[in-house]
Design a protein with these regions (language model features):
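Glycine-/proline-rich flexible loop or hinge segments
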Residues: 7-14, 42-50, 257
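A short acidic, glycine-rich active-site loop
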Residues: 11-22, 101-118, 218-233
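Glycine-rich, proline-tolerant flexible connector loops at the mouths of alpha/beta enzymes
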Residues: 1-26, 84-88
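Active-site-proximal loop/turn and secondary-structure-junction residues that shape catalytic pockets
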Residues: 2-7, 45-47, 81-85, 140-144, ...
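Short, solvent-exposed loop/turn segments at secondary-structure boundaries
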Residues: 12-17, 50-56, 177-179, 265-268
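Active-site acidic/histidine proton-transfer and metal-coordination neighborhood
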Residues: 30-33, 47-164, 286
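Histidine-acidic metal/acid-base catalytic patches
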Residues: 32, 73-75, 88, 121, ...
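Conserved beta-strand positions in the central sheet of alpha/beta enzyme cores
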Residues: 2, 40, 78, 137, ...
Length: 287
């Protein structure tokens, strides 16, 4: 359930829940009444945004999410690493993705040394004191400084075991990564998982590549877009992913995300649920 940040749907009133034990009891009671288990608090945003009007509220939101998770007995908070600005200041994040010239090559390292590592180190230390049972799970996402196993490993080295991975395979497929190989790489650092697919249109990729500035995406023209589980990759791919998660020691939920621009949320969730159930049944039958 989300508390704000980039998410338009704020499922939880963070301030009220932090302030009032009665509000927390009411929330937990309503969840029990509807047989709903709250397994994660989501605070996706950019706490490293160079504009304080954006970065400071997102950083405060993340800490509030960690505090709330501890108060309501939830041990996972999902967010992203964030992305800082460049060396020369400015109010816009700079995503260092491809070292075309020497300046680009050194940018990520500068961001890591001066922004990412200090922030993650301090956040991990604070979390260990304020909410020792909570893991902050970074969704590896292009546009954030932690977007693949190598960049996450650097952040993990600066923080520690209470900063892990939210494994969302949809962000790997369009970048050319194999989610199973990613799972093998990050292994026990996986603290949460999302169920979301990616539909890559090969004919459009041949003409226009994978990088696209259009948002929200137009599924009629985009080279790729997020899709319901099973509509971008088949049952074999999803069964292999579930098996890899279990092999890595992850036995938590796979939280379905709806971001398929072609269908309603209800259709997306129903399709995703059917695919994931088949994948889990195959893995269980083969065990």
């Amino acid at each position: 359930m989300g508390v704000g940040g980039w998410r338009q749907a704020d499922h939880l009133d963070l301030d009220a829940l932090l302030r009032d034990a009665g509000e927390r009891d009411r929330l937990l009671g309503e969840l029990r009444e509807h047989s709903i288990e709250l397994v994660c608090v989501n605070a996706a945003g950019n706490p490293l945004h160079p504009d304080p009007a954006v970065g400071d509220p997102h950083a405060a939101l993340l800490r509030g999410a960690v505090e709330l998770a501890a108060l309501i007995g939830c041990d996972r908070v999902v967010t992203m690493s964030g992305c800082p600005g460049g060396r020369d200041g400015g109010s816009t994040p700079v995503f260092a993705s491809w070292p075309v010239v020497p300046d680009d090559e050194s940018l990520w390292q500068w961001q890591y040394e001066h922004r990412l590592a200090p922030y993650c180190r301090e956040l991990a230390a604070w979390t260990a004191q304020a909410a020792p049972g909570v893991m902050i799970c970074l969704e590896l996402h292009a546009g954030a400084s932690a977007y693949n196993p190598a960049s996450f490993a650097r952040i993990r080295a600066a923080s520690g075991p209470n900063v892990g991975v939210n494994l969302d395979p949809s962000h790997f497929w369009w970048q050319g990564m194999d989610p199973v190989a990613v799972i093998e790489e990050v292994g026990p650092a996986i603290g949460f998982a999302h169920g979301k697919d990616t539909l890559v249109h090969a004919d459009r990729v041949r003409r226009n590549g994978l990088l696209d500035l259009g948002f929200p995406v137009d599924p009629e023209t985009a080279s790729w877009h997020f899709s319901a589980v099973g509509t971008g990759h088949d049952d074999d791919a999803w069964a292999a992913l579930v098996e890899a998660l279990r092999g890595a020691g992850y036995d938590g939920v796979i939280s379905i995300e709806h971001e398929d621009p072609r269908v309603t949320p209800e259709e997306s969730i129903e399709t995703s649920l059917r695919t994931l159930r088949r994948a889990c049944e195959r893995v269980e039958a083969a065990a």
